[in-house]
Design a protein with these regions (language model features):
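Alpha-helix capping/helix-boundary segments
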Residues: 39-40, 91-92, 148-150
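Active-site proximal beta-strand in glycosyltransferases
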Residues: 2-8, 100-117, 132, 143
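N-terminal strand-loop element at the rim of the active site
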Residues: 8-65, 152, 163-166
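Short His-centered aromatic/hydrophobic patch
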Residues: 87-93, 111
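Donor nucleotide-sugar binding/catalytic pocket of nucleotide-sugar-dependent glycosyltransferases
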Residues: 52-53, 133, 137-179, 183
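Short beta-strand scaffold positions
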Residues: 35, 86-87, 144-145
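Nucleotide-sugar donor phosphate/pyrophosphate-binding loop at the beta->alpha transition
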Residues: 15-17, 64-71, 106, 116-138
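Nucleotide-sugar donor-binding and catalytic loop/hinge architecture
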Residues: 1-2, 177-189
Length: 189
């Protein structure tokens, strides 16, 4: 059976927003996820074949921490030997993507949002785009959750032509999170 690895920066977010996709993938492949140990850990363990705890400093910009994450991704890929890797969120997309590219493992990147580093501009935007470019160039596909993010990144030249896909329906499962009218009174909860 094929092996798929999924890299993300939050176990709860991966479970809450990707469990339907993971369940479908499980019908066709063994699924390993590498995520930090936080929300929904036990549920994620029941859903997949293997969960590897891999800390991700989601908001930090420490190059020592990020280089450690890159090395951990390299080691994990060498151990798991996946046939395909899916990455979610900026650090797994960049460092996981680069690790996959160096290991010649096919991978697809899901850009869930641009984040403040790109949206705020300046030197940090240039730095992040410089990291994104080689990470995305090796990807088999670059998935976006909205056309605006795709257009913004495509305009910078970091997205490989013909490999970008805007997903329709990458949002929440309305059976798990039913529609509720917006409250006009009091704080939003």
């Amino acid at each position: 059976m094929k092996k798929i690895a999924i890299l993300a920066n939050h176990s709860g977010g991966l479970y809450d927003f990707r469990k339907d996709l993971i369940s479908e993938l499980k019908k066709h492949a063994n699924v390993t996820v590498a995520v930090p140990h936080n929300d929904r850990w036990e549920e994620l363990q029941k859903l997949v074949d293997e969960v590897i705890e891999l800390p991700v400093d989601r908001r930090g910009m420490n190059p020592i921490h990020d280089s450690k994450l890159f090395r951990q991704y390299r080691a994990m890929l060498k151990e798991v030997k996946p046939d395909l890797v899916l990455t979610y969120t900026i650090k797994p997309n960049i460092y996981g993507g680069l690790a996959c590219r160096m290991a010649h493992i096919p991978y697809a990147v899901n850009i869930t949002g641009l984040g403040s580093a790109i949206e705020n501009g300046g030197w940090l935007k240039k730095f992040v785009l410089a990291l994104y470019k080689p990470a995305l160039q090796g990807a088999r596909g670059v998935f976006f959750e909205n056309a605006g993010n795709r257009d913004t990144l495509a305009a910078t030249g970091v997205v490989p032509k013909g490999r970008d896909v805007v997903l329709s329906g990458a949002g929440v499962n309305l059976e798990d999170y039913p529609y509720q009218p917006y409250s006009q009174e009091g704080p939003v909860r």
